[in-house]
Amino acid sequence: MAVLDIVTYPNKVLKQISKPVERFDKDLHKLLDDMYETMIKNNGVGLAAIQVAVPIRALLIDIGDEEGKQSKDTLIEVINPEFLTWDGTQKDTEGCLSVPDYFDEVERYKNVKVKFFDRFGKEHVMEAEGLLSVAFQHETDHLDGHLFVERLDYIKRKKFEKEWKKLLKQKRKK
């Protein structure tokens, strides 16, 4: 397994709409394994393929067990996700490996039902609530070319853009 480079905002790659996965083969398995290594190394709870510059509809979610411990047992590999139902709303603080060091409150659906395939092409339907629901929505947004900061209201979005420019300037000085 390899740790892959994560594409960061404002790279235009993140705006691409990902294509459906058609082949469930060893190349897909290697990508998923490398994505898992990358996500864990970067302390993430989710990672979409587009975040490692691969524009396919594949993502990982691992919110951990009851104690927050992540492992292959708590990993959900999601290929070609499709939301079947959604209801309620909740606000939670989100962050993103593609927008490092920035966190803000985003409103999402509280409950979702998602149809997807695993690495072997087996179909699954899962109901998710709370953090898992947020993770499904956040990662699927990536597949559609959207970042969580686009869901911020106008004032928060302007604040983000100002803070982001400041962070970039600080990083360039180092």
From Swiss-Prot:
The keyword ATP-binding does not apply. Binds 1 Fe(2+) ion. Keywords: Hydrolase, Iron, Metal-binding, Protein biosynthesis. The active site is at E139. Its cofactor is Fe(2+). It comes from the Bacteria. One of its GO terms (molecular function) is metal ion binding. InterPro entries: Peptide_deformylase, Peptide_deformylase_sf. It holds the Pfam family Pep_deformylase. Fe cation binds at C96, H138, H142. CDD domains: Pep_deformylase. The keyword Hydrolase applies. It catalyses: N-terminal N-formyl-L-methionyl-[peptide] + H2O = N-terminal L-methionyl-[peptide] + formate. Its EC number is 3.5.1.88. One of its GO terms (biological process) is translation. Removes the formyl group from the N-terminal Met of newly synthesized proteins. Requires at least a dipeptide for an efficient rate of reaction. N-terminal L-methionine is a prerequisite for activity but the enzyme has broad specificity at other positions. Belongs to the polypeptide deformylase family. This is Peptide deformylase. It comes from Nautilia profundicola (strain ATCC BAA-1463 / DSM 18972 / AmH). The gene is def.
